[in-house]
């Protein structure tokens, strides 16, 4: 299990921050990060393609997994911001048209299109934006640059590049290949919510039981973000629902910490032990209460009541 220094979530959980913005310091993040963004987190860069850098943590720390969740949620906020910017741009054009305001581009100014993950829901650095490539509008279909060879099998899995991933696996037999931290393509895909990739990897021989150097599992990574579809696929493969990592974090504790109600319920129904405690003495119920997650607390309470009723019978 963990040392007390790694998993100390006592009164600090309640006093320092509210549940909605709660985060714990010191967690090396798992995230897809663009080159302009700051990257002070620990971990090794796996590669850069079209301005994208992949970072893995040296250890997956239960105490600060909220920062991992927050980093993966950044994409959602970027999508919202892009929609707002798009709406403002359209409104501006319509306003100028209604007022007969004629504008012309400033001389000497070149417009450079920057593609980010928020450009499309399933962004890929090796795919051009197809926003203006509808055939019925007379636009030409953009071509995909041949950059697949510059990406590792782990990056392909994280991005959901099924075609290139399948080709790479067939040619090199790297379906269970581990990176410097012991992470497999399946773990990368699970951490980034790539449902189709996870299903493909499992169907083609990926081992869901493999653990990272810090005993990180694909199940724990999926639970920390609440990817219930991926969690279900992994549970159906018979993975250990109570597998703990280097600091005592279990899939259930990660799901509770992320306030993922459906995921918590699914884990409990599949044998997750709610009484397992961290090194500092906190179990899943204690953690839910400390973070103020009432829905999660109710799910755990209901499960415990059922267990007690079964014992009486």
UniProtKB/Swiss-Prot annotation:
ANK repeats lie at residues 148-180, 181-213, 214-246, 247-279, 280-313. Keywords: ANK repeat, Cytoplasm, Cytoskeleton, Membrane, Repeat. It is a peripheral membrane protein. One of its GO terms (molecular function) is ubiquitin protein ligase binding. It is found in: Cytoplasm, Cytoskeleton; Membrane. InterPro entries: Ankyrin_rpt (IPR002110), Ankyrin_rpt-contain_sf (IPR036770). GO terms for cellular component: 3M complex; cytoskeleton; cytosol; membrane; nucleus. Its main location: cytoplasm. GO terms for biological process: regulation of gene expression; regulation of protein-containing complex assembly. May regulate the interaction between the 3M complex and the histone deacetylases HDAC4 and HDAC5. May also regulate LRP2/megalin. Interacts (via ANK repeats) with CCDC8 (via PxLPxI/L motif); mediates the interaction with the 3M complex which is composed of CCDC8, CUL7 and OBSL1. Interacts (via ANK repeats) with HDAC4 (via PxLPxI/L motif). Interacts (via ANK repeats) with HDAC5 (via PxLPxI/L motif). Interacts (via ANK repeats) with LRP2/megalin (via PxLPxI/L motif). Interacts (via ANK repeats) with RFX7 (via PxLPxI/L motif). Interacts with AHRR. Interacts with NEK6. The ankyrin repeats, mainly ANK 2, ANK 3 and ANK 4, mediate interaction with a wide array of PxLPxI/L motif-containing proteins including HDAC4 and LRP2. The PxLPxI/L motif of interactors can contain a Ser or a Thr residue in position 2, which phosphorylation prevents the interaction with ANKRA2. PANTHER family: ANKYRIN REPEAT FAMILY A, ANKYRIN REPEAT FAMILY A PROTEIN 2. This is Ankyrin repeat family A protein 2.
């Amino acid at each position: 299990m963990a040392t007390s220094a790694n998993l100390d979530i006592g009164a600090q959980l309640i006093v320092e921050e509210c549940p909605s913005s709660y985060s714990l310091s010191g967690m090396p993040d798992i995230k897809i990060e663009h080159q302009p963004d700051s990257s002070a987190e620990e971990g090794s860069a796996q590669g850069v393609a079209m301005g994208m850098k992949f970072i893995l943590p040296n250890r997956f720390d239960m105490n600060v997994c909220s920062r991992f969740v927050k980093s993966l949620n950044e994409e959602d906020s970027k999508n919202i911001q892009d929609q707002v910017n798009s709406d403002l741009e359209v409104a501006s054009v319509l306003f100028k048209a209604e007022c007969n305001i004629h504008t012309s581009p400033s001389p000497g100014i070149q417009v450079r299109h920057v593609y980010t993950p928020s450009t499309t829901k399933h962004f890929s650095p090796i795919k051009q934006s197809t926003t203006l490539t509808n055939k019925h509008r007379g636009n030409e279909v953009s071509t995909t640059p041949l950059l697949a060879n510059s990406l590792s099998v782990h990056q392909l899995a994280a991005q959901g590049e099924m075609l290139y991933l399948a080709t790479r696996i067939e040619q090199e037999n790297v379906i269970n290949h581990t990176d410097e931290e012991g992470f497999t393509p399946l773990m990368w895909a699970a951490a980034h919510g790539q449902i189709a990739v996870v299903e493909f990897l499992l169907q083609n021989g990926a081992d869901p039981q493999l653990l990272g150097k810090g005993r990180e599992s694909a199940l724990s990574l999926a639970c920390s973000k609440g990817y219930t579809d991926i969690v279900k696929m992994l549970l159906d493969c018979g993975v250990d629902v109570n597998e703990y990592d280097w600091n005592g974090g279990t899939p259930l504790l990660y799901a509770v910490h992320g306030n993922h109600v459906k995921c918590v319920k699914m884990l409990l129904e599949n044998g997750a032990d709610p009484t397992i405690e961290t090194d500092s003495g906190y179990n899943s119920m204690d953690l839910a209460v400390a973070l103020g997650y009432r829905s999660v607390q109710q799910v755990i309470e209901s499960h415990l009541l059922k267990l007690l009723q079964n014992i009486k019978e």
